[in-house]
């Protein structure tokens, strides 16, 4: 995306420069005319005051805007690179290891800046702005002419209202050049449109890649870290770069031609002025109009290009936002799936979701439908005998039940099912949020549905009556048909039977459709009943909350009244205490005044006078003021103490009043929060009721559509002429089915008798088993007694063994007797064993060397040597390969022994030895190839056609990655392999070249075997 944006902006800059060369910006300021505004269209002639002579008087400063680009750091990206060893281990086992590195990511930013540029003033041209505009025609007049109306200046500097252009004449060569320039601009516009189409195609591919990435993320597959980019994107980018380079070259050529044309126009104007002065108001020429159109087209192309760039940027931003939104959506979906899985694990189905009466009716209906289906199946199996016998009898079988009675029973059951739901709807109270308005509408819709069902049942009853009459006529016709000789009407009977079979199948399908429709209606009634029950529960909870709110409001009003009464009491008490305190203060002031007057009137000394010889202690100790009369006197102290006590009571009253007010404020705040919660709960209940109302409306609409479809089907069935005949034959088949049902009933009774006999035999078997169990219990008891007896016998044997052991320990030998006479000599015994060997003797002298012996016999021929297998292979790649993984070299050039698998690209060593392995990997141009040679899933060697890239962040950062030149990657090494080792080439990055001629080859051969590797 970055190269595409960079080249597009570069193209827009070139087009802007070309437009600027054709038309100068209107903001120009002359530094020598003394005017601060823009220059007049007439140039120097429009000014009355003469311009000062200066060398640079024809140059003006213009404020221009430029778009500059800069390289900014855009975060850090990670990339994976292969390394043979871990970090800091010089010697390590040769295995494939990948390491993740960080490197800065850069982006190209664009900014519009203003700059001052020196250009030729309006009306001047040339390389050094020395070419002045052409003077006016006619003799010079001393009186100044009125200034012309300002107009938009053209390229030559003359005003648009002049009758002649300032080019000094237009020749055929100039018109041809202008026409060529116009054609070139048109071709450039077409190329820009083609480039826009290519960019749109690239954006489409980007959208496909984004969609594929999202699908991969949803499916749980991840792209490998070292996977290469798509080759189609690189090829498209290379093509875009090539086209942009061509456009750059053409724009430069056009810019040069425009410069030459401007210079030529300037020279022509100067020469034309010397030959024939042009009038002051010359009309614009066709060349000027063409140049103006060229300027407009260039500006439009630039604006379109900039708008396209902005659109691509916005589209890229939208794609990024969509990716983020899809990631968030994926995360929310996964979270929801986990939540649903947890709910499914912890959730148990309700014990009773439906009424037992409704379940019983549904079970009975299903049972009857199963009976009908089974009867039809039995009929199709025995149609040869049963139908023939029934047709020969020519009458109705016993137990005949018409289809009308069955449909009427189904209708009664459906009405009985809808009855409780209608009663619940009638007894349902009105609810807020439009529930009271919805319930009458729903009741009306249910009544309409009931009327429609009644109409349908009436029409079906009438048609069934007609069908009964037609069935009777058909049975009589069938009896007349079957009354003849059996050999004459065999073909007609077979046709009738086949037609009956087809019609029976059709009737069965129609009955199943009717049953499914009734089942759907019953399910809808159940759903509506469940919805009504849920609404009733919600309204009940809302009523409880409203009652609780009423109680809370009443309590709140009572507490407000009590607080108001208490406030009134406190105000009265405070006013009374205030009056009493003010009166006490007045009395205290009067008493203080009287005391002050008494002190002033008192002239007698309080102490006796001292004599001249009296000491300091003659007069006795001085007396202090009386207690209670130091500040206040009389009863004023007690009054103040009483006033202080009353004020303390008032303060305590105010404190309790403040506490009560705080509690009241807290209660009011809690009531506000409760009211807010109740409001939110009410809003949720109203929204839930509205949702349920909408669902009920949708369900009613759907039911109306279904009944409308049922009516249309009924009308279509009524228009069918052969339906009555089919139903008549179906009625006859139903009569025969009743006969079959009677036979099945007899079979059931016989089976019941057999089952009763089996139960009797089972009871006898149980009795015999009980007797045998009693005998087995006796045997088990006898075995228990036998065990006790065996234990006693074992103890007796143990006692006997102990006694025998004691007897064996006793010495039973008697005293020694007298010695007897000597006996005769015995026989000679056997020889004794050999003694130990003696010490070796001394070595004798060595004898002389004997003569050579005769030649020995020829040995037996040895076994033949083990055959060495011939192992060699060579394979090439003929199919495109760009995905990372093992490269399957499918075109086999040589495969001695068949140890190379072309489908997987893996070579398996048959025996241990030294093998020569080589591979030549050819990549696409401007795209490097990176691969690894693996031995038994372990990397042995690595090749990178782009060259060695140092590891680390100290490399010089670049704004964009340059395409690497396409080179070869070659493997050639000798490896020791054991029997069963596998060797393959794993592609890490890039795209391999494929063709009929071998470009990418993988080869190997056995050099010699090594038995030591087998024992290693």
Swiss-Prot record:
Gene Ontology molecular-function annotations: extracellular matrix constituent conferring elasticity; identical protein binding; integrin binding involved in cell-matrix adhesion; molecular adaptor activity
Tissue expression notes: Distributed in tissues where resilience and elastic recoil are prominent. Highest levels in the adult small intestine, aorta, lung, uterus, and appendix and in the fetal spleen, kidney, lung, and heart; intermediate expression was detected in adult liver, ovary, colon, stomach, lymph node and spleen; adult heart, bladder, prostate, adrenal gland, mammary gland, placenta and kidney showed low expression whereas a series of other adult tissues, including skeletal muscle and different regions of adult brain show no expression.
Coiled coil region boundaries: 216-256, 356-420, 576-603, 685-752, 835-857
The protein's assembly and partners: Homotrimer associated through a moderately stable interaction of the C-terminal globular C1q domains, allowing the nucleation of the triple helix and then a further quaternary assembly to higher-order polymers via intermolecular disulfide bonds. Interacts with EMILIN2. Interacts with EFEMP2; this interaction promotes the incorporation of EFEMP2 into the extracellular matrix.
Signal peptide positions (record): 1-21
PROSITE patterns cross-referenced by the UniProt entry: C1Q, EMI
Residue ranges occupied by any Collagen-like domain in the UniProt entry: 814-864
Location of the C1q domain: 866-1013
UniProt-annotated stretches for the region Disordered: 135-182, 257-288, 383-402, 416-435, 811-863, 942-961
Other information: Its deposition precedes the appearance of elastin and is simultaneous with that of fibrillin 1.
Biased composition (Gly residues): 386-397
SMART domains (UniProt xref): C1Q
Disulfide bonds: 60-121, 85-92, 120-129
Protein name: EMILIN-1
Keyword Signal applies: yes
GO terms under cellular component: collagen trimer; collagen-containing extracellular matrix; EMILIN complex; extracellular exosome; extracellular region; extracellular space; integrin alpha4-beta1 complex
Outcome of mutating residue 250 to C: In HMND10; unable to rescue locomotor defects in Emilin1a zebrafish morphants; reduced extracellular deposition of EMILIN-1 from patient cells
UniProt biased composition (Pro residues): 821-839
Record has Coiled coil as a keyword: yes
Record: glycosylation sites: 154, 415, 455, 561, 658, 766, 794
Effect ascribed to mutating residue 22 to T: In HMND10; uncertain significance; decreased secretion; accumulates in the endoplasmic reticulum
Biased composition range(s): Low complexity: 139-165, 266-279
Keywords: Cell adhesion, Coiled coil, Collagen, Disease variant, Disulfide bond, Extracellular matrix, Glycoprotein, Neurodegeneration, Neuropathy, Secreted, Signal
Localization per Swiss-Prot or TrEMBL: Secreted, Extracellular space, Extracellular matrix
Domain EMI: 56-131
Its biological purpose: Involved in elastic and collagen fibers formation. It is required for EFEMP2 deposition into the extracellular matrix, and collagen network assembly and cross-linking via protein-lysine 6-oxidase/LOX activity. May be responsible for anchoring smooth muscle cells to elastic fibers, and may be involved in the processes that regulate vessel assembly. Has cell adhesive capacity.
């Amino acid at each position: 995306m970055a190269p595409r944006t960079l080249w597009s902006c570069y193209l827009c800059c070139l087009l802007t420069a070309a437009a600027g060369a054709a038309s100068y910006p209107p903001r120009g300021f002359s530094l020598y005319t003394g005017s601060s505004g823009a220059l007049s269209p007439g140039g120097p002639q429009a000014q009355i005051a003469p311009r000062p002579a200066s060398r640079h008087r024809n140059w003006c400063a213009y404020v221009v805007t430029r778009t500059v680009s800069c390289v900014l750091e855009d975060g850090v990206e990670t990339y994976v690179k292969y390394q043979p060893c871990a970090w800091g281990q010089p010697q390590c086992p040769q295995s494939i290891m990948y390491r993740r590195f960080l490197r800065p990511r850069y982006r190209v930013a664009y900014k519009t800046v203003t700059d001052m540029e020196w250009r030729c003033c309006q009306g001047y041209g040339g390389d050094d702005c020395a070419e002045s505009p052409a003077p006016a025609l006619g003799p010079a007049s001393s009186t100044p002419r009125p200034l012309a109306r300002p107009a938009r200046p053209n390229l030559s500097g003359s005003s648009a209202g002049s009758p002649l252009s300032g080019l000094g004449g237009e020749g055929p060569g100039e018109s041809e050049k202008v026409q060529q320039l116009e054609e070139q601009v048109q071709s450039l516009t077409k190329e820009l449109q083609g480039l826009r189409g290519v960019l749109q195609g690239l954006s489409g591919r980007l959208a496909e890649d984004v969609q594929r990435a999202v699908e991969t993320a949803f499916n749980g597959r991840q792209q490998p870290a070292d996977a290469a980019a798509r080759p189609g994107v690189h090829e498209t980018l290379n093509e875009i770069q090539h086209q942009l380079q061509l456009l750059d070259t053409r724009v430069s050529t056009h810019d040069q031609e425009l410069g030459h044309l401007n210079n030529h126009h300037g020279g022509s104007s100067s020469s034309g002025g010397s030959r024939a002065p042009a009038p002051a108001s010359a009309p614009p020429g066709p060349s000027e109009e063409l140049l103006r159109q060229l300027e407009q087209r260039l500006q439009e192309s630039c604006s379109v290009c900039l708008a396209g760039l902005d659109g691509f940027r916005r589209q890229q931003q939208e794609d990024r936002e969509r990716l983020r939104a899809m990631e968030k959506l994926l995360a929310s979906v996964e979270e929801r799936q986990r939540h649903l899985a947890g709910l499914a694990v912890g959730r148990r189905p309700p014990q009773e979701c439906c009424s037992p009466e409704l379940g019983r009716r549904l079970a009975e209906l299903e049972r009857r439908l199963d009976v009908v289906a089974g009867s039809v199946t039995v009929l199709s199996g025995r149609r040869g005998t049963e139908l023939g016998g029934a047709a020969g009898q020519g009458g109705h079988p016993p137990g005949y039940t018409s289809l009308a009675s069955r449909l009427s029973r189904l209708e009664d059951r459906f009405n009985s099912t809808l009855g409780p739901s209608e009663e619940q709807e009638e007894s349902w109270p009105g609810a807020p949020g439009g529930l009271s308005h919805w319930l009458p509408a729903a009741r009306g819709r249910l009544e309409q549905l009931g009327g429609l069902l009644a109409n349908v049942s009436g029409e079906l009853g009438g048609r069934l009556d007609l069908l009964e009459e037609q069935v009777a006529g058909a049975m009589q016709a069938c009896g007349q048909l079957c009354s003849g000789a059996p050999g004459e009407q065999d073909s007609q009977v077979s046709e009738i039977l086949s037609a009956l079979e087809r019609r029976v199948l059709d009737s069965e399908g129609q009955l199943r459709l009717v049953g499914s429709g009734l089942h759907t209606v019953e399910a809808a009634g159940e759903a509506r009943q469940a919805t009504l029950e849920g609404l009733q529960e919600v309204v009940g909870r809302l009523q409880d909350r409203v009652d609780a709110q009423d109680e809370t409001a009443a309590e709140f009003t009572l507490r407000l009244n009590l607080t108001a009464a208490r406030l009134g009491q406190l105000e009265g008490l405070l006013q009374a205490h205030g009056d009493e305190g003010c009166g006490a203060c007045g009395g205290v002031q009067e008493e203080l005044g009287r005391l002050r007057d008494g002190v002033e009137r008192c002239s007698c000394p309080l102490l006796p006078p001292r004599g001249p010889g009296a000491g300091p202690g003659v007069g006795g100790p001085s007396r202090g003021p009386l207690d209670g009369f130091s500040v206040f006197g009389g009863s004023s102290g007690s009054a103040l103490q009483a006033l202080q006590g009353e004020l303390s009571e008032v303060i305590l009253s105010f404190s309790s009043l403040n506490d009560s007010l705080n509690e009241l404020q807290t209660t009011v705040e809690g009531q506000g929060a409760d009211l807010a919660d109740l409001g939110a709960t009410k809003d949720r209940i109203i929204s839930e009721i509205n949702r349920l109302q909408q669902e009920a409306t949708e369900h009613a609409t759907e039911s109306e559509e279904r009944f409308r479809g049922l009516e249309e089907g009924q009308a279509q069935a009524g228009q069918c002429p052969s339906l009555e005949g089919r139903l008549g034959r179906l009625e006859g088949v139903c009569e025969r089915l009743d006969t079959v049902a009677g036979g099945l009933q007899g079979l059931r009774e016989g089976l019941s008798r057999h089952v009763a006999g089996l139960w009797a035999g089972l009871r006898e078997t149980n009795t015999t088993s009980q007797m045998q169990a009693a005998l087995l219990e006796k045997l088990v008891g006898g075995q228990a007694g036998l065990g006790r007896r065996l234990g006693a016998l074992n103890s007796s044997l143990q006692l006997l063994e102990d006694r025998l052991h004691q007897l064996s320990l006793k010495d039973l030998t008697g005293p020694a007797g007298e010695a007897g006479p000597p006996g005769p000599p015995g026989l000679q015994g056997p020889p004794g064993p050999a003694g130990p060997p003696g010490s070796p003797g001394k070595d004798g002298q060595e004898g002389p060397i004997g003569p050579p012996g005769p030649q020995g016999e020829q040995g037996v021929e040895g076994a033949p040597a083990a055959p060495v297998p011939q192992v060699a292979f060579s394979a090439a790649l003929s199919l495109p390969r760009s995905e990372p993984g093992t490269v399957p070299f499918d075109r086999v050039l040589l495969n001695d022994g068949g140890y190379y698998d072309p489908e997987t690209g893996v070579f398996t060593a048959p025996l241990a030895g030294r093998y020569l392995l080589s591979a030549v990997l050819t990549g696409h141009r401007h795209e490097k190839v990176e691969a690894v040679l693996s031995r038994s899933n372990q990397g042995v060697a690595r090749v990178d056609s782009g060259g060695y890239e140092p590891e680390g962040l100290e490399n010089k950062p670049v704004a964009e990655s340059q395409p690497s030149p396409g080179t070869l990657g070659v493997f050639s090494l000798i490896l020791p392999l054991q029997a069963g080792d596998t060797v393959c080439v794993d592609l890490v990055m890039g795209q391999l070249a494929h063709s009929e001629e071998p470009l990418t080859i993988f080869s190997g051969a056995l050099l010699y075997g090594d038995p030591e590797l087998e024992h290693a």
